[in-house]
Amino acid sequence: DRVSKILNIKYPVIQAPMLGVTTPEMVAAVSNNGGLGSLPVGGLSAEKTLALIQRTKELTDKPFAVNLFAHPIPAVVDENEFNAMQDFLSQLCTTDGIQVEQQAVDKLRFYSYKDLISTLISENIKVVSFTFGVPDDESIEILKANQAILIGTATSAEEAKILDKKGMDMITVQGIEAGGHRGS
């Protein structure tokens, strides 16, 4: 079938990139059994991303995708809003006996998918998927110049049209029945 040929896999099965629960072992297991494993790295640092990719490569020589979050990174986090959110979460957690460590707003670090492009290139990643938005033109150009297959995520016909115009090679379509969050 067309999907299997494009992705160089045996079966047209793509494992969902589930940040927080997916491990290199899961990704490799899917890829080693003929599907396309997907390694989620949205919001992670380049160093952490590199370590996860290298661990996955230790476990498989088959194709796997790396999934990035393409949402905009906030320029400024309002300290009062951040503290109010932490106080609210602390109250909720205390009710259930869960310990919560407060974070200082000035210690927050947000990583953009743009911070990871050079890592993907250096590791010769050939399938890159995106969720929570559309990558910028420069990132698309760099990845395509390195023969990466790009997969976008759409939750509406309008989003699919935008992804198509941007040059995605494939588009994952999610409906309201998607498990967990939706990719927009």
Please give the residue ranges for each predicted region.
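Active-site entrance/lid segments in N-terminal catalytic domains of soluble metabolic enzymes
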Residues: D1-S184
